[in-house]
Amino acid sequence: MGRFKIRAVDGPHDFTKFTETMKRIVLMGATSGIGLALAERLAADGHRIGVAGRKTEVMRELQKRYPEQIVYSRIDVTDAEAPRKLHDLIERLGGMDVYFHIAGIGFTNEALETDRELLTMQTNVVGFTRMVDTAFRYFRDHGGRGHIGAITSVAGTKGIAQIAAYSASKRFQQTYLTALEQLARRQRLQIRFTDIRPGWIRTPLLDADQEYPMSMTLGYAVPRIHRAMVSGRRVATVDWRWRLLTAVWRLIPDALWVRMRIPISTIASEAQTRRNETAAEAPLKRLEGPAPTASQKGPDAKPAVATADSTAKPKV
């Protein structure tokens, strides 16, 4: 990611730096992988977190670990009732300064099984739009300022055959965030936008029996995602290798791109599969440990994230 620094945003989008005060942050999709690790890190930083997802037991354990920082709600972004539940969560949180959308799904689907393609779109396009729009309207109606962020993907750079619906849905998310930023400027709203585009991250999203090129562990990726959230960068690609690769991808004409075979994964050894399975559960295993003491909490606490040598499962 390179050297980290916070940059001021001039004009109507200038507002208090993320790290200077406690923030009320809603994490949509924070019951596994990136979202869960990020929730732990932000709670340890002293922020108040509204955790939303589908795994109630995970959220309950997270609240036990950080009882003063965490409130939670079971929310499925594909449910029409999700916006109402989000507003209820915001009320219990005491308001919202930051909305961060992590919820997503994806399949390797060369057979083009329609149910899988539509489920991906229902979650990553319809659900994403439903929740991000709700957050935008909330900020518009409550002072006209806030921060909307999302985990999109490097897969949104180009259409990728094996993950057609996934790559298309991520391109939609990136374009939609740009459109909302333009809308915020037209309406003179102080809403900031962050589009975080990771490469492969070892999370439970994909199969443990596969090896993915240039994959990253949660312990490596989450601090970089955290930096991107609090920095002034509009778009952040994680990490530098993927920044270089996607820069090359953009230079390739579509007429040539469609003739290329883009490798997604290879079969992992049995030993590596076991390591992947173990590491994918790392954030959940941490919740089974003892709760942190008061001295471990607050802005000076050491972030609770996976170690850099852990190997959890990839997300594009």
For each feature predicted by the language model, list its residue ranges.
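Conserved glycine-rich cofactor-binding loop
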Residues: 31-32
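Active-site helix of classical SDR
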Residues: 132, 169
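Residue(s) in the substrate-gating loop at a strand-loop-helix junction
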Residues: 153
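Short alpha-helical oligomerization interface
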Residues: 109-122
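SDR active-site lid
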Residues: 36, 182-242
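Conserved NAD(P)H cofactor-binding loop of Rossmann-fold oxidoreductase domains
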Residues: 102-108
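Rossmann-fold cofactor-recognition segment
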Residues: 66-81
